[in-house]
């Protein structure tokens, strides 16, 4: 049956009714309008759900584009200022108008040829990435063994603990956390394990359980829109793109300024868990997952964490794992410059605090949700944690990431 026939069938079979005043739904638009007003307001000023840290996602969008080597116009900055003022006044008519204009400015941002971003190779595909790195031979792992099952249990438990801990403190500097709480060595309140650190991994697992190692980025994307109602920053825009029929890799690049933020990097663990002892396979799966919402260095962040997770099943020395993972990032990429700098700081500084301060200063132009400062904090925590989970957790918590 053709679409016109379906529509005609509905029309021909419609039976006239008289609706009561209460049944008419035009006034329901008032509630719908309030929903969209509140949702838009979050882009201009909100608080992180778990920690309460303030954030302004529209400001961060400009920051993220400039980090990626683009120049936002003076008009864009003027609109940014006006939007912040309109949001503060709750002038939603003006805020909707400014937001539309602002998004056009972001979409039309011009390449900044003077940006150091373009001094590095930008990696657009797994094939391009694969040609530039050397992977070790895969080490067979008996996935039916009790040892492997215990490793998987520990992996999930550690992620849940880390996620619960992180959501309490994310978005605050080390200095302010220290001032407010001293040394944080345990939960500051009753932990909550529901967060986006885990939900996207479960969506990947859902697609993987059906397709196995043949899983595609499209499979993962469909799992997202079927299971995850909403996201934030890169993931929110990717979900919106997918629902509009824009699939990977375009879902991660189309009007998505946040595609080098932490989102892909944070969900990499599952890719390593389903590829134990095989970092090349873990990297390939991470690329498929990453390009749903991210691109370039954002995907390399997921690759980095995925290969570390994969190697952790067959290597117990944490510094060896981190160092080997760094070697699996192309040396001409900007992401490599970040992780190698963080590693160098660790090698040269006596304390994690000293290493952190150096990284904070070097990457102060990046939002705390960007992949780069997060990667630095990971390396610092793993290096100085020396394989002790409690010590590592303490350091990463104090980093406020």
Name every feature range the model reports, one short phrase each:
Residues 1-118:
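Long, charge-dense tracts
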Residues 113-132, 138-139:
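N-terminal regions that are enriched for targeting/export leaders
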Residues 191-199, 257-263, 294-302, 367-371, ...:
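Active-site nucleophile and cofactor-binding loops and adjacent substrate-binding regions
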Residues 153-169, 260-267, 298, 401:
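Conserved phosphate/anionic-ligand binding catalytic regions in large, soluble enzymes, centered on
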Residues 191-231, 261:
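Aromatic-rich carbohydrate-recognition surfaces in CAZymes
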Residues 134-201:
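An N-terminal structural lobe/cap that precedes and organizes the functional/catalytic core
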Residues 217, 222-262:
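Extracytoplasmic mature domains of secreted/periplasmic and thylakoid-lumen proteins
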Residues 130-144, 148, 239-243, 249-259, ...:
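Accessory "access/gating" subregions that flank catalytic or transport cores
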């Amino acid at each position: 049956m053709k679409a016109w026939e379906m529509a005609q069938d509905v029309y021909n079979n419609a039976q006239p009714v008289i609706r009561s005043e209460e049944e008419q739904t035009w006034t329901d638009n008032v509630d719908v309008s309030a929903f969209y007003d509140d949702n838009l307001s979050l882009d201009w000023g909100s608080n992180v759900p778990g920690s309460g840290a303030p954030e302004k996602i529209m400001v961060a969008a400009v920051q993220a584009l400039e980090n990626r080597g683009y120049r936002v116009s003076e008009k864009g900055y003027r609109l940014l200022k006006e939007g912040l003022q309109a949001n503060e006044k709750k002038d939603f008519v003006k805020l909707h108008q400014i937001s539309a204009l602002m998004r056009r400015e972001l979409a039309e941002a011009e390449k900044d040829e003077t940006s150091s971003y373009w001094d590095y190779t930008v990696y657009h595909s797994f094939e391009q990435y694969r040609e530039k790195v050397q992977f070790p031979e895969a080490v067979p792992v008996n996935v039916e063994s009790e040892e492997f099952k215990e490793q998987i249990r520990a992996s999930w438990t550690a992620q849940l603990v880390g996620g619960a801990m992180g959501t309490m403190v994310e978005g605050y500097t080390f200095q302010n956390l220290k001032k407010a709480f001293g040394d944080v060595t345990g939960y500051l309140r009753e932990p909550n394990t529901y967060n986006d650190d885990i939900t996207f991994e479960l969506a990947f697992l859902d697609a993987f359980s059906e397709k196995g190692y043949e899983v595609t980025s499209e499979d993962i994307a469909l799992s997202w829109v079927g299971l995850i109602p909403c996201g934030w920053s890169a993931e929110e825009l990717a979900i919106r793109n997918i629902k509009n029929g824009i699939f990977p890799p375009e879902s991660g690049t189309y009007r998505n300024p946040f595609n080098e933020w932490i989102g892909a990097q944070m969900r990499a663990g599952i890719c390593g868990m389903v590829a134990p002892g095989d970092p090349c396979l873990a990297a390939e799966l991470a690329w498929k997952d990453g390009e749903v919402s991210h691109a370039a260095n954002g995907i390399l962040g997921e690759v980095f964490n995925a290969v570390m997770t994969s190697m952790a099943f067959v290597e117990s020395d944490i510094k060896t794992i981190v160092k080997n993972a760094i070697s699996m990032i192309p040396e001409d990429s900007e992401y490599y410059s970040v992780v190698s700098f963080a590693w160098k700081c660790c090698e040269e500084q006596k304390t994690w605090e000293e290493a952190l301060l150096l990284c904070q200063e070097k990457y102060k132009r990046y939002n705390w949700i960007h992949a780069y400062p997060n990667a630095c904090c990971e390396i610092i925590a793993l290096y100085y944690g020396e394989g002790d989970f409690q010590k590592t957790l303490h350091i990463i918590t104090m980093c406020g990431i």
